[in-house]
Each structure stands twice: as structure tokens, then as C-alpha cells.
Curated annotation (Swiss-Prot):
It catalyses: heme b + (2E,6E)-farnesyl diphosphate + H2O = Fe(II)-heme o + diphosphate. Its EC number is 2.5.1.141. This is Protoheme IX farnesyltransferase. GO terms for molecular function: protoheme IX farnesyltransferase activity. It comes from Sulfurisphaera tokodaii (strain DSM 16993 / JCM 10545 / NBRC 100140 / 7) (Sulfolobus tokodaii).
Length: 301
């Protein structure tokens, strides 16, 4: 009995460590922002007359299903990029790099997460499941396998993976895809390049060592900073345009935070250093979070 207890305890420890490794690879912070996008889409799509049970099931389906599929895609990405991650200080801690999660294991677990997440999406409706699967497909196949190793357009086109989260949320509550849901998803698409180019400019040497053709690797710092500023400037009108649907409070908040984001973008352009790029990167996620949270709050009150 004692040996059995020890064995069970060791198995539990081993499984818990594996679970922690999978969570690390799934990038919880990224998933939390995608979930926020899904919630914003869900709230925007809520009909005037709702069935409480149906809405709760649909909400849980898109959040749980979307989180699993997104996490699965990132776990597969970890398996795909072991060699590149070894060359980058920023990613050298990942369980796939340390050998704690093997390549085939990452592919298997990630695929299971995506399939299960998509199936859960069907509890809302088929359109929700479609967008959940689409987000994972864009991230794994279009971005990670096809574009990321080949072109600086990788993160631009790959931004549609984030858009799919918002579209899935809207579909879960409304069962439809409309101009409003498109605009919300397109806002996330437009936000993506400035966010990740700022990160790539901060860790330019890392990306260069890994031979990943991010824009800041292929151009000088000033050109990269200019691209970030232009990208953010092009995004802002879409953030404000949603104000036509969301009302005055949202418009005021989005104007204030957008002005601050543009201020930081101009600062980066005038002084394109790693520190300024890091400030731009660290601001961009809270910017999007504030936009989405404001949208959620004003539509619920």
C-alpha cells in the first residue's frame, strides 16, 4: 500500500508539472487578451431578448473552447520553433527548449486542445466553432508554418488569428457575422503589427540570431519605428469608428487612450531605441484591453 501511495503521489507530481509546462507554452497572457476580445464580441452581439440558459452555455462554450484552441495553437508553435527559440534569450526558458516537452508531444497535445476546443464551440453554434477553428488554423498553418519563416508580412496577415476570437464571441451570442463584428475583429487585426513590431525592435538581435524575418530585422531602427507609428495611426480610426455603435463614453475613453498611444509611437519614431520600443510594446496590450473593457462596460450598463 505504501509503495502504491508513493507511486500515485509521484504520478500526480509528474502530471502537475506537465500541466504547468503546457500552460507555459499556451501563453496565458495572450489567451487572456483573446478571451477579452471574445467577451467584447459576445456582449456586442447580445440580442435584446435573451434566454439566460442559452446565453450562459454559449458564453462558456466560446471562452473555454476558444481558450483551449488558442492554447493548443501556441503549444504546437512551441514544437515548431524549438531550434529558433534556442537562439533567442527571450524564449530560452520554454519547456520545449529545455526538453521538458518534446516536439511530437507538443504537436499531439496542441492538436487535441484545438479539436476539443472546436467541438466545445459547437455548444454555442456552428459559426462559433468555425471561427474558433479558423483562429487556430491561421495561427498554426498560415502564420507559424508558412509566413513567419519567410516574410515580414507574417505578423500582419497573422493578425487575423486574433480577429477570429472577436468574431467567435459575436457569433456565440448572435449566431451571425455582421459589419460590427467585422470592425471589432479588424481593429484587433490593425493593432497586431504595431504591438509585435515593437517587441521585435526591442529584441532585434534575438530575432536576427533566430533568422526570423520580422520587419525590424530587415530594416533599420528608424524605418521600423516609422512603420510602428504608421500602423498605430491607421488602427486608431477603427477604434473610434466603433464609437458609432458604442456611444459617447466609449468614444471619449478610446480617444484619450488612442492619443496616448500615438504620443508613445511618435516618441519611438523620434528616438528609436530598445527602451522606447519596449515602452511601446508594454503600452499596446493595456491599450487594447482598455478599449475592449470599455466596450464591454458601456454595452452592459
Amino acid at each position: 500500500m505504501k509503495i502504491t501511495r508513493i507511486y500515485v503521489r509521484l504520478m500526480a507530481i509528474s502530471l502537475s508539472r506537465k500541466l504547468i509546462d503546457y500552460i507555459k507554452l499556451s501563453k496565458p497572457r495572450v489567451i487572456s487578451l483573446l478571451d477579452l476580445a471574445a467577451i467584447a464580441g459576445f456582449v456586442l452581439g447580445l440580442p435584446k431578448a435573451i434566454n439566460i440558459t442559452s446565453i450562459i452555455v454559449s458564453f462558456l462554450a466560446v471562452i473555454i473552447g476558444g481558450s483551449l484552441a488558442s492554447g493548443g495553437g501556441m503549444i504546437i508553435n512551441g514544437g515548431l520553433e524549438i531550434e529558433k527559440d534556442k537562439k533567442m534569450k527571450r524564449t530560452s526558458w520554454r519547456p520545449t527548449v529545455k526538453g521538458e516537452v518534446g516536439r511530437k508531444e507538443a504537436y499531439a497535445i496542441g492538436s487535441i486542445f484545438i479539436v476539443v476546443g472546436t467541438l466545445i464551440g459547437f455548444l454555442a453554434n456552428p459559426l462559433t466553432a468555425l471561427f474558433i477553428a479558423l483562429g487556430a488554423f491561421i495561427y498554426v498553418v498560415i502564420y507559424s508554418i508558412w509566413l513567419k519563416p519567410r516574410t515580414w508580412w507574417n505578423i500582419v496577415i497573422g493578425g487575423f488569428a486574433g480577429s477570429a476570437a472577436a468574431w467567435a464571441g459575436f457569433a456565440a451570442s448572435s449566431g451571425s457575422f455582421t459589419l460590427l463584428s467585422f470592425l471589432l475583429g479588424f481593429l484587433i487585426f490593425m493593432w497586431t503589427p504595431g504591438h509585435f513590431w515593437s517587441l521585435a525592435l526591442r529584441f532585434r538581435d534575438d530575432y536576427k540570431n533566430a533568422e526570423i524575418p520580422m520587419l525590424p530585422v530587415l530594416t533599420d531602427e528608424r524605418t521600423s519605428a516609422k512603420a510602428i507609428a504608421i500602423s498605430n495611426a491607421l488602427m486608431v480610426p477603427f477604434a473610434l469608428l466603433i464609437g458609432l455603435y458604442a456611444g459617447l463614453i466609449y468614444l471619449i475613453v478610446s480617444t484619450i487612450v488612442s492619443a496616448f498611444l500615438l504620443y508613445v509611437s511618435v516618441k519611438l519614431y523620434l528616438n528609436p531605441t530598445a527602451d522606447e520600443a519596449w515602452e511601446s510594446f508594454k503600452l499596446s496590450s493595456p491599450y487594447l484591453a482598455i478599449i475592449l473593457l470599455t466596450l464591454i462596460i458601456v454595452k452592459l450598463i
